[in-house]
A protein has these predicted regions:
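C-terminal motif of bacterial Sec signal peptides marking the signal peptidase cleavage site
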Residues: 8-10
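Solvent-exposed, well-ordered loop and adjacent helix/strand elements within mature globular domains
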Residues: 12-352
Length: 352
């Protein structure tokens, strides 16, 4: 009966998360097309700063992409109409979407800011760890919480919230504020323990604690605020994976391409299809403050500059910036938009 219900539900094409059905069916992740037809409002202004950072910081990516970047910049400044991209020597490959109708999933990530102290006390007692020398036999989360890394000098600071540290692990990096000397520092990703990742959001859904349709980072935080420390710890221990950090000498938020990320211009992507530095034209779904699609998309230029373990094929993870509000916005995203990879004439679907 359950399978029958699911089958019947699948007959109606969903549109509640920004899905569109405008271009027929696709059978590949990247599908060469001759033109883009989009009447969405345009906003390309974040792309230029992201492009300049790539050209300044990465000679190798500059050598590969500079000609494309300048052509895209010329188009954005003098036309901006996606129907004219071919006039600027730019070819297109549309992403097929997980459903085969061009609906690419957008999720979001951000850089949290958490409060730390250099020394533990009765409140700030949960450590943030640097990478231990444990090779392929690193302890899992339960063992680490039980003290498996104690006495190794790996503590970078102490938080009052086990969940805050966990959320920084999920994002892969974040900012920390040491109130004892009013220092803001960026903690970059420094590796993980090699154990499999388990979604605590999925665990809460399966336990009936949070409805599937309301699941978000905000929903997890609200649930945790009502629990005692032992209950929160038990939930976090369902995920044996553990992320380690290293202090950065700058406040730049770096993606895996080694380039500072600009909010709403950088995405994590599957580098098998979108190598680092790839340029994307995307109809990005817009959400209201409650995290629901507001019926609109905005046409943006994006750049693939990061990766993620869960970001595969027709999935983009949009960087939202730093701080609490960015986290709320990013945590709501699991919506859809059309996406095209851009390349110089004759280059697609491969790299330009």
């Amino acid at each position: 009966m359950a399978l029958l219900v699911l089958g019947l539900a699948g007959c109606a094409r969903p549109t509640d998360r920004g899905q569109q059905y405008l271009d027929g069916e696709f059978d590949q992740v990247l599908n060469p097309v001759s033109t883009v037809s989009s009447d969405k409002p345009r906003d390309y202004h974040e792309f230029k700063q992201q492009m300049e950072l790539v050209l300044e910081r990465s000679p190798s990516m500059a050598a590969t992409y500079q000609s494309l970047y300048r052509q895209v910049e010329n188009w954005a400044e003098n036309s901006g109409d996606p129907a004219t991209l071919g006039n600027y020597g730019i070819d297109l490959a549309q992403m097929g979407g997980g459903d085969g109708y061009g609906n690419v999933m957008f999720t979001g990530y951000f850089s949290p800011v958490i409060e730390l102290r250099h020394q533990p006390d009765a409140t700030y007692r949960y450590p943030v760890y640097a990478m231990p020398k444990c090779g392929t036999s690193c302890p899992n989360r339960t063992a680490i919480y039980a003290g498996a890394l104690d006495g190794q000098g790996l503590e970078l600071g102490y938080s009052a919230s086990m969940l805050d540290i966990f959320m920084m692990e999920v994002q892969g990096s974040g900012f920390v504020h040491f109130e004892d000397n009013d220092q803001l520092q960026y903690f970059a990703y420094n590796g993980k323990n090699g154990h499999p990742y388990v979604s605590i959001g999925k665990v809460l859904i399966e336990r009936g604690e949070v409805p599937r349709e309301k699941m978000s980072l905000k929903a997890i935080s609200e649930w945790a605020a009502k629990q005692d420390d032992a209950t929160v710890r038990e939930l976090l221990e369902q995920n044996p994976s553990f992320v380690f950090f290293k202090p950065s000498s700058t406040l730049d938020v770096m993606g895996s391409a080694g380039i500072p990320l600009q909010a709403h211009a950088a995405v994590a992507a599957d580098r098998k299809y979108l190598p680092m530095g790839s340029v994307l034209l995307a109809e990005v779904p817009q959400l209201d403050r409650e995290g629901k699609w507001n019926g609109k998309h905005v046409l943006k230029l994006l750049m693939a500059l990061d990766t993620g373990g869960a970001v595969k094929k027709n999935h983009l993870d949009l960087y939202h910036g730093m701080g609490h509000e960015a986290g709320i916005d990013a945590g709501h995203y699991k919506h859809f938009g059309r996406v095209w990879k851009l390349g110089l004439h004759g280059s697609l679907p491969a790299m330009p």
